[in-house]
């Protein structure tokens, strides 16, 4: 057979670049006799020795040969160089320049957007989003500047996402509200294929109404202290920035607390609770609520402990009944529990009927009030009951808890057959006091 030279074709993968950012070049040698000696690759005049895969030659039906070779290389390695395929047979050399596999350059559209002033104030930080849209090839560099100085932290750039041959990406900058409201200039800088684009956005000049967080600590309820083995401390943080961290400690030891809840009574509050033993609370130990946030120069701390009481005074408890003439004349009558002479002021008063708890909605307690000499306190509790229930002989108990009581709890019980309780006229002033406390 008469020798014939190879016909060379330069090939590119249909989708460039590949998902890993690499480019695939192909070299196809066809219709030659005899077989060729070698297939090699060059970048400009430099031999390429990695990323090569040359397939065995194939004898065609018409008696000629075909052979192919593939080069896998990254865009950055190619740069602006030209890629060549070189085929040898003996002393003969054939060279084919491979077409540019990088495709057309499409520079991105860069858009900056920011969160609203209301959101910045409520969440205590500003978010600036840099959207980088429709570019090719994939490789880009994103950086942020503040007043012209490169920033090292505070932003996150997402991986690129390819759709229909072009790519998109986003970069998100987070700025503390106090800093945002100081009129600084923030710049998103995008570099793509030798072209750099910058987009600027300026923080607000409106003063930030971002008051420092305020910590309020709430002790456990007196009922919990007297009746339960564990008690709950509550930390309410007002003016809390978004993402605030609230923790509890006791003498430098971290305590396991309930997850902080945001919001509380208002949109800027955080509530955190911790359960401790009642014994630890009664011992007077100090417990700390610690508030941390990136916008705070140092953590905020507040402490709480049970105050030592030196002059405990046990309450006296009496149940008073409406005037006798009212009992038979009305469908309802009132029982009043008078608790007086106690110190300190922390106390609980509730009712039971036949040893079952009465719904708190069915009775009303006044505020704890100081006696005339201001050395002790008193409180009233008013229970309204149906006359027929009283007539049936049901037993009603006023249950009082106070730390000065030896057994912590006092019960005073009354019913129709237990003997006549004291009959008193409930003054309008007392009723007004009860009603005003609801």
UniProtKB/Swiss-Prot annotation:
The keyword Coiled coil does not apply. Residues 100-205 are annotated as: CH2. Residues 206-308 are annotated as: CH3. Residues 1-99 are annotated as: CH1. It holds the Pfam family C1-set. Keywords: Glycoprotein, Immunoglobulin domain. Residues 309-418 are annotated as: CH4. It comes from the Eukaryota. Glycans are attached at residues 164, 200, 245, 275, 374, 411, 415, 425. CDD domains: IgC1, IgC1_CH1_IgM, IgC1_CH3_IgAGD_CH4_IgAEM. SMART domains: IGc1 (SM00407). This is Ig heavy chain C region, secreted form.
């Amino acid at each position: 057979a008469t020798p014939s030279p190879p016909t060379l074709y330069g090939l590119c993968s249909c989708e460039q670049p590949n998902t890993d950012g690499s480019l695939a070049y192909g070299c196809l040698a066809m219709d030659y006799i005899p077989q060729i000696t070698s297939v090699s690759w060059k970048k400009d005049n430099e031999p390429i020795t990695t990323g090569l895969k040359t397939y065995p030659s194939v004898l065609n039906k018409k008696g000629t040969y075909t052979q192919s070779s593939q080069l896998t290389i990254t865009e950055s390695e190619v740069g602006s160089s030209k890629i060549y395929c070189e085929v040898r047979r003996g002393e003969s050399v054939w060279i084919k320049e491979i077409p540019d596999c990088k495709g057309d350059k499409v520079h991105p559209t860069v858009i900056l957007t920011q969160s609203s002033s209301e959101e910045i104030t409520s969440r205590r930080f500003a978010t600036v989003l840099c959207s980088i849209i429709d570019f090719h090839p994939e490789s880009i560099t994103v950086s942020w500047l503040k007043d012209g100085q490169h920033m090292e932290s505070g932003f996150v750039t997402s991986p690129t996402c390819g759709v229909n041959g072009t790519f998109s990406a986003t970069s998100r900058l987070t700025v503390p509200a106090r800093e945002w409201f100081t009129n600084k200039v923030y710049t998103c800088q995008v570099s793509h294929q030798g072209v750099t684009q910058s987009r600027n956005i300026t923080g607000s000049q409106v003063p930030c109404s971002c008051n420092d967080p305020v910590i309020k600590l709430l002790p456990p309820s007196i009922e919990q202290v007297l009746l339960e083995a564990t008690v709950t401390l509550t930390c309410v943080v007002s003016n809390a920035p978004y993402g605030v961290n609230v923790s509890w400690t006791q003498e430098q030891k971290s305590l396991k607390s309930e997850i902080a809840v945001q919001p509380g009574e208002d949109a800027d509050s955080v509530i955190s609770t911790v359960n401790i033993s009642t014994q630890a609370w009664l011992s007077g130990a100090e417990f700390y609520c610690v508030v941390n946030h990136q916008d705070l120069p140092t953590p905020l701390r507040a402490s709480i402990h049970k105050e030592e009481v030196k002059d405990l005074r046990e309450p006296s408890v009496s149940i008073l009944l409406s005037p006798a003439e009212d009992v038979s004349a009305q469908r309802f009558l009132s029982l009043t529990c008078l608790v007086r002479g106690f110190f300190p002021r922390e106390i609980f008063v509730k009712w039971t009927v036949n040893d079952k708890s009465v719904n708190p909605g069915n009775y009303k307690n006044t505020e704890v009030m100081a006696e005339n000499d201001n050395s002790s306190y008193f409180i009233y509790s008013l229970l309204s009951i149906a006359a027929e229930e009283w007539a049936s002989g049901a037993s009603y108990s006023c249950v009082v808890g106070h730390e000065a009581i030896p057994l912590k709890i006092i019960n005073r019980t009354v019913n129709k057959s237990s003997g006549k309780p004291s009959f008193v006229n409930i003054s309008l002033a007392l009723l007004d006091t009860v009603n005003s406390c609801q």
